[in-house]
A protein has these predicted regions:
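Eukaryotic intrinsically disordered, low-complexity segments enriched for acidic and Ser/Thr/Pro residues
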Residues: 1-14, 199-203
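Canonical positions in the second alpha-helix
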Residues: 50, 98-99, 122, 176
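Inter-repeat boundary and helix-capping residues of tandem alpha-helical solenoids
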Residues: 11, 17-20, 89, 103, ...
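Hydrophobic/aromatic side-chain positions at a characteristic register within alpha-helices
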Residues: 16, 32-36, 124
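Helix-turn-helix repeat elements of alpha-solenoid scaffolds
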Residues: 1-8, 33-48, 81-93, 115-119, ...
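Long alpha-helical HEAT/HEAT-like repeat alpha-solenoid scaffolds in very large eukaryotic proteins
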Residues: 150-184
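Amphipathic alpha-helical repeat scaffolds of TPR domains
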Residues: 18-33, 45-48, 52-81, 102-117, ...
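Residue-level detector of alpha-helical secondary structure
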Residues: 13, 48-51, 167-173, 177, ...
Length: 203
């Protein structure tokens, strides 16, 4: 059963086990288990009860859950299953925005909000935040990849300005600690930089 999405459903089981071990978010654990069993309607009924209860919790409890959840799902392809839209909209996003107000000098909520402005703010507050650094590099390079994806016929944007953006990604790359991540990102950056330079030489 579910063989074609086995990794996704294994993620649900692992996350349920982790939530149950903590002991505070048992309904979220039950949601994951019912979803893993393919019982979507029952799972979302449980999730809605959990959301209703969590919305009434103090900020500290909501922050603890959101921090645990986002740390748990980081890098997982099953993120959309572990954080369905109702949970994202009603708990995760409001809590993150409140967090930036309650703790203005904390990098973590900015890291998880994850747009370019907030990722840059996260690194201002904590230059050692590896997740924020990696996310920002990837976001910058996806923008560049969009600009170059019609080459050699057309460039979407300003290649000269985008070379400066690539140089920012190269600067950020120096702070990546994981050598595997660093090598992979370096290859991505080098390929895009070469594509822009070749386009400019051919003009």
């Amino acid at each position: 059963m579910h063989y074609w999405r086995k990794d996704f459903f294994e993620s649900l089981k692992r996350t349920a086990s982790s939530a149950r071990a903590i002991g505070t978010w048992l309904e979220y654990a039950d949601f994951c288990l019912e979803y893993e069993r393919g019982l979507r309607r029952q799972a979302f009924a449980i999730l809605h009860r959990f959301i209703s209860d969590m919305e009434r919790k103090p900020f500290e409890e909501r922050r603890r859950f959101v921090s645990w959840l986002l740390t748990t799902v980081e890098g997982q392809e099953a993120r959309h299953m572990l954080i369905p839209n109702p949970l994202q909209i009603q708990i995760v996003e409001p809590t993150l925005m409140e967090w930036t107000q309650v703790e203005p000098h904390c990098a973590e909520p900015h890291r998880w909000i994850g747009d370019r402005e907030h990722l840059e703010r996260a690194l201002e507050l904590d230059p050692d935040d590896q997740i924020a650094r990696r996310k920002l590099i990837i976001q910058i390079m996806r923008y560049i990849d969009y600009a170059t994806h019609h080459l050699p016929s057309v460039y979407l944007g300003s290649p000269v300005e985008d070379l400066a953006v690539v140089e920012k990604a190269e600067f950020l790359l120096k702070g990546i600690a994981n050598e595997t991540d660093k090598a992979s990102l370096a290859t991505f950056i080098a390929e895009e930089k070469t594509a822009i330079q070749e386009y400019l030489r051919g003009k």
